[in-house]
């Protein structure tokens, strides 16, 4: 009897240790779109938006905070939207291409789905976002290669009328642009000889940008933001020092006026600036004791 009990116990243990076979997951589980993604909140905080499948393509939905009802504001059937963002409290902009050609164009629509506009729907032309000008509801800075397929020029786009204004012809070496607090294009960053970086500057859009500083691959200067009066800039630089520092700088000469923050051990990894309040909030760096610091 004792032997039978031992055998029964061993059999029960063997059954308990037998691994359970997990059900196979269907292939579409790995490739299908998520039910909802890319959540964003409107600038005034009254609405939120997200992307969700409709007709098997990702489209944009808008929902009022506190409501259970969402409004679909796009109706794309051929291609997923590449991305979207809020232009202001009442309008959303999005990018899409045609047939997978990756020539992304800019479109806009109101949050109730009305007043759709194709801002840059030019065949063979690609659009990039340079500066959404978050504090200027009706304007933004975009780049397109409509003048030259190899070069992106900056334009000011009026979201109400769709009018584009060329701000500067890119000679071909400019890789980035920067605006002041009035939305004026003032700074260009160019790559010289594939190695060196050149900062170009102008006082107003009536002028051409001119070179003010060229740095090699060991040096760095970047403008984080203009001061509230648009006369000087907050810059991160390692010129004349081993580690990056946050300084006040004259953009017309790249002359340092004041050191605002420096760390003898670590480089800065970020500068926090409030566009709404027009002031520095702090800086960050990576280290063992890396807090967010107010300069």
Predicted features and spans:
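Positively charged n-region of N-terminal signal peptides that target proteins for export
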Residues: 1-4
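Sec-dependent N-terminal signal peptides
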Residues: 6-10
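C-terminal motif of bacterial Sec signal peptides marking the signal peptidase cleavage site
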Residues: 15-16
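A short helix->beta-strand "capping" segment at the edge of beta-propeller domains
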Residues: 20-36, 67-70
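Peripheral, non-catalytic segments that deliver or gate enzyme domains
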Residues: 31-37, 43, 55-60, 75-82, ...
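Short Gly/aromatic-enriched secondary-structure transition segments
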Residues: 63-64
């Amino acid at each position: 009897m004792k032997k039978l009990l031992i055998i029964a116990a061993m059999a029960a243990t063997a059954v308990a240790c037998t691994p359970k076979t997990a059900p196979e997951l269907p292939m579409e589980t790995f490739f299908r779109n998520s039910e909802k993604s890319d959540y964003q909140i409107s600038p005034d905080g009254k609405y939120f938006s997200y992307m969700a499948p409709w007709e098997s393509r990702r489209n944009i939905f808008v929902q009022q905070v506190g409501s259970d009802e969402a409004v679909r504001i796009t109706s794309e059937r051929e291609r997923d939207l590449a991305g979207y963002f809020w232009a202001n409290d009442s309008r959303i902009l999005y990018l899409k291409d045609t047939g997978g050609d990756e020539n992304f164009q800019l479109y806009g629509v109101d949050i109730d789905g009305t007043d759709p506009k194709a801002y840059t729907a030019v065949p063979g032309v690609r659009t990039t976002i340079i500066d959404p000008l978050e504090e200027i509801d009706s304007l933004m800075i975009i780049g397109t290669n409509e003048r030259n397929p190899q070069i992106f020029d900056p334009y000011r786009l009026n979201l109400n009328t769709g009018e584009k204004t060329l701000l500067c012809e890119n000679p071909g070496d400019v890789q980035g642009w920067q605006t002041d607090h009035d939305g004026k294009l003032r700074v260009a960053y160019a790559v010289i000889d594939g190695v060196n970086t050149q900062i170009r500057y102008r006082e107003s859009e009536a002028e051409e940008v001119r070179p003010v500083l060229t740095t090699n691959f060991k040096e760095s200067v970047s403008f984080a933001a203009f001061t509230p009066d648009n006369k000087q800039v907050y810059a991160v630089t390692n010129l004349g020092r081993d580690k990056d520092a946050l300084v006040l700088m004259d953009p017309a000469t790249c002359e340092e006026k004041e050191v605002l923050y420096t760390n003898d051990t670590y480089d800065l990894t970020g500068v926090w600036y409030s566009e709404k309040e027009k002031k520095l909030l702090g800086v960050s760096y990576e280290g063992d004791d890396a807090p967010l610091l107010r300069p």
